[in-house]
A protein has these predicted regions:
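Extended, charge-enriched "interface" segments that sit outside catalytic cores
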Residues: 1-3, 7-155
Length: 155
């Protein structure tokens, strides 16, 4: 079992390993090019989510049809995508931006899944990164050779 499962997911393996594999000669140029194109599309969709504001008239019909509270003023898309019942696809349709995002390939299922997961689990992922950084600091801590372990009562 992996200690940091939220970071070591199957759906982000290519993001974690393709660059390393390419530098070791294990990933072909074609595969690396496809990966870079995917990352460009992911970046475009990520920027769309971060820069888009959703107006009440765009999202409220959907929220009300689900029995959820409507919004009263424009809200950043990042806040809406955080709701468990709202998918990125629903958000794009509500914002009426599908055609523009389709044109750049940002609505491919794999791209959508990657970015939706990134935003829905952002808080958990950030906490996990913080834990990893804390563990790295602890690993660098040097225990003095003169320490008397038998005098430590909690061991």
């Amino acid at each position: 079992r992996a200690e940091h499962r939220i970071l070591l997911r199957q759906d982000n393996a290519d993001q974690r390993l393709t660059k390393i594999g390419h530098s070791l000669g294990l990933v072909t140029e074609g595969r690396h090019t496809r990966f870079q194109q995917k990352m460009e599309k992911c970046l475009a969709l990520e920027q769309w989510v971060e820069s888009t504001s959703i107006k009440p008239e765009q999202i409220n019909p959907l929220l009300e049809s689900m029995g959820k509270s409507p919004i009263k003023q424009s809200v950043k898309a990042t806040a809406i995508i955080g709701r468990p019942e709202i998918s990125l696809e629903m958000l794009i349709d509500a914002a009426n931006d599908r055609e523009r995002l389709d044109a750049i390939g940002a609505t491919q299922p794999e791209i959508m899944h990657t970015i939706e997961t990134q935003f829905k689990y952002a808080g958990y992922i950030e906490k996990e990164f913080e834990m990893v950084e804390e563990l790295k600091k602890q690993e660098e801590l040097i225990i003095p050779e003169s320490i008397h372990y038998n005098k430590i009562k909690s061991l």
